[in-house]
A protein has these predicted regions:
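Alpha-helical transmembrane segments
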Residues: 5-8, 74, 132, 194-203, ...
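Membrane-interface helix caps and helix-loop-helix hairpins in membrane proteins
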Residues: 89, 183-184, 209-214, 309-311, ...
Length: 454
């Protein structure tokens, strides 16, 4: 039981961190002047999570599970402390990057710990419980963030999570035996080159909102997109990959499915980044209420996924779910500026429900139609594509918001303008995601490609 609590606690750190931070970001910006960096705060955390997740297994193999968890928890706690102490937005972003890196290590190592600490007969139940931790975080973290924001002590939220990170380190040292999880180091190196190029791509896209002219912003965005293409090319040729080799080819099932995940995640992340600020400014929502509205998407995702679990046909749920996501995005563009608030809540929950309807069926179809040697990559690449999409989308949302003047401070007029364009601008990307879903569910989707070619 104590070891079960340990892996749940490690998962909780990242699960609760994201929504807590989203809830308090308006308070952070008012205090240290970070309105221009909203998107970067999310993107930095996600980039750290990608690198941490990609190297967690190797960390365990090289040093053993207990030292690896100590390093992960320590880096996470250090990041929380840096965010709590930050005198400026630059230090805050560094803290968020360290939180993402440490949190990515901790979550990845907790999944490694399941196979090391529990008999195989218990794996399914433990993994189900870890999924439940994410649901619990949806209910609790808006309350945590809201209470600290309303008390005017947002830094206290990060001190709270720093303390939890340190407690996790102590518990891991007491509960995990020395040498657990260690093995002979693997020959291949972690995907550092791909993560570096991906980081540069996200920075270039996010920087588009910081240039003084539209021409410079366009060049920055184009460079970012070109670097994304280079990332896919490098990853396909690397021995240590983040994605299947076919990820860049939408004619394949894996390529179409991962494109769908990337586009829809990138298209919808803007509400997670700016939703709290927009709701507080335009609709006078208290931080706690704004946080729970943000969490409504995750709650609806879970409820919809449970409602359709084991049912079919999968084609219907994939197409319906992805279509609902696009319609919800249009609904947010129309209702965020002027309300009413109950309709906004409906749109937020519809967006989450769309993901819940489509996700498990999409995952099953991607894995089932991927060649056997690539199936491990296909399984692990779906959350990776989700993180990459969220990081790119957060950077793009930040660029759009800054081009609309959001970086100079949040006024009602600026919030109303941003409230429309932050969602309307991503509707075409959501449409691409829906078209990719149609390719994923094409009647001829069998084997490795949708066209039947090798």
């Amino acid at each position: 039981m104590p070891k079960f609590a340990l892996v749940c606690a490690g998962t909780w750190l990242t699960a609760a961190d994201e929504l807590t931070t989203a809830t308090i970001m308006p308070s952070v910006a008012r205090d240290i002047g970070g309105y221009a960096w909203f998107g970067w705060a999310v993107a930095a955390f996600l980039l750290g999570s990608i690198l941490g997740g990609a190297t967690a297994g190797r960390l365990s193999v090289r040093f053993g599970l207990r030292p690896a968890l100590t390093v992960g928890g320590g880096v996470y706690a250090l990041g929380c402390a840096a965010s709590a102490l930050s005198p400026s937005i630059g230090w805050f972003l560094l803290g968020r990057l360290l939180q993402g890196l440490g949190g990515g290590w901790v979550v990845g190592l907790c999944y490694v710990a399941v196979s090391s600490l529990f008999p195989q007969s218990m794996w399914a139940r433990v993994f189900s419980a870890l999924a439940g931790v994410w649901g619990a975080a949806t209910l609790v973290s808006p309350l945590i963030g809201g209470l600290f924001a309303e008390a005017g002590v947002w830094r206290g939220a990060f001190w709270l999570f720093a303390a939890q990170g340190l407690a996790f380190i102590v518990a891991g040292a007491l509960l995990i035996r020395p040498g657990a999880g260690a093995a002979e180091p693997q020959g291949e190196r972690p995907p550092y080159a791909q993560v570096l190029v991906l980081t540069l791509a996200v920075v270039a896209i996010g920087a588009a909102g910081l240039w003084p002219t539209g021409g410079e912003a366009a060049v920055s965005a184009i460079v970012g997109l070109a670097l994304l293409g280079l990332f896919l090319r490098l990853d396909a040729r690397a021995s240590a990959r983040l994605l299947p080799r076919s990820a860049g080819d939408p004619r394949t099932v894996a390529g179409a499915g991962l494109l769908m995940i990337f586009c829809l995640q990138a298209a919808t992340i803007a509400f997670s980044v700016y939703g709290s600020a927009l709701l507080q400014t335009l609709h006078h929502a208290r931080p706690i209420l704004a946080g729970y509205i943000l969490g409504g998407s995750a709650f609806a995702w879970t409820a919809a996924a449970l409602g359709v679990a084991g049912r079919g046909p999968d084609v219907l749920f994939i197409r319906l779910g992805t279509g609902v996501i696009g319609l919800a995005l249009i609904g947010l563009a129309l209702t965020i500026p002027h309300g009413p608030l109950p309709v906004i809540v409906v749109c937020v929950m519809a967006q989450g429900a769309g993901f819940g309807l489509a996700w498990s069926f999409s995952a099953a179809r991607i894995v089932a139609n991927t060649p056997e040697p690539e199936r491990a990559f296909a399984s692990s690449s779906m959350p990776t594509a989700q993180l990459i999409g969220a990081a790119v989308g957060a950077a793009a949302a930040g660029a759009i918001a800054n081009l609309l003047g959001f970086g100079h401070g949040v006024t009602t007029a600026r919030a109303s303008l941003a409230g429309f364009w932050l969602f309307a601008s991503f509707v075409p990307l959501a449409a691409v995601g829906w078209l990719a879903a149609l390719r994923l569910t094409a009647s001829g989707a069998s084997g490795a490609t949708l066209t039947g070619s090798a």
